[in-house]
């Protein structure tokens, strides 16, 4: 008998600064509910919601703006399992299956992480190399895979 995993549909954004393509700096934020965990904006896709609508909604909820333009989309859905310390909190899900987008902040867009339900308490725009140095959690392999793909395609 096969044990099927129950993955939560999710969308994630790699947000480039508005100075892209002249400068390639990527937004990364520190979670307010976990110690020293930096990540990209992401969130669940509501039932009946399109992936792109979820992308814009999650950006507005997490970073205070949806003023972005989509540059590229990762061609596959990527999944990961929740670590044991958070799996109970996320019940009935075993992990998430994510669709990644590469987006650029529009000129004049303002980041505001002090949202109605803040998920982050700090953020930075950093280089690709710095991203790899800052990520030290269970999503690191996915981050590396997605960023390498966008690098190989010439986007970053």
Swiss-Prot record:
InterPro entries: Nudix_hydrolase (IPR020476), NUDIX_hydrolase-like_dom_sf (IPR015797), NUDIX_hydrolase_CS (IPR020084), NUDIX_hydrolase_dom (IPR000086), RppH (IPR022927)
Gene3D superfamilies, alphabetized: Nucleoside Triphosphate Pyrophosphohydrolase
Classification via Pfam families: NUDIX (PF00293)
Sequence ranges assigned to domain Nudix hydrolase in this UniProt record: 6-148
CDD domains per the UniProt record, alphabetical: NUDIX_Ap4A_hydrolase_plant_like (cd03671)
Hydrolase as UniProt keyword: yes
Cofactor(s) demanded: a divalent metal cation
SUPFAM superfamilies xrefs: Nudix
Motif (Nudix box): 43-64
UniProt keyword Metal-binding, yes or no: no
Keyword annotations of the record: Hydrolase
GO molecular function: pyrophosphatase activity
PROSITE patterns listed in its UniProt record: NUDIX, NUDIX_BOX
EC number: 3.6.1.-
Stated role: Accelerates the degradation of transcripts by removing pyrophosphate from the 5'-end of triphosphorylated RNA, leading to a more labile monophosphorylated state that can stimulate subsequent ribonuclease cleavage.
Family the entry assigns: Belongs to the Nudix hydrolase family. RppH subfamily.
Name the UniProt record assigns to this protein: RNA pyrophosphohydrolase
Gene: rppH
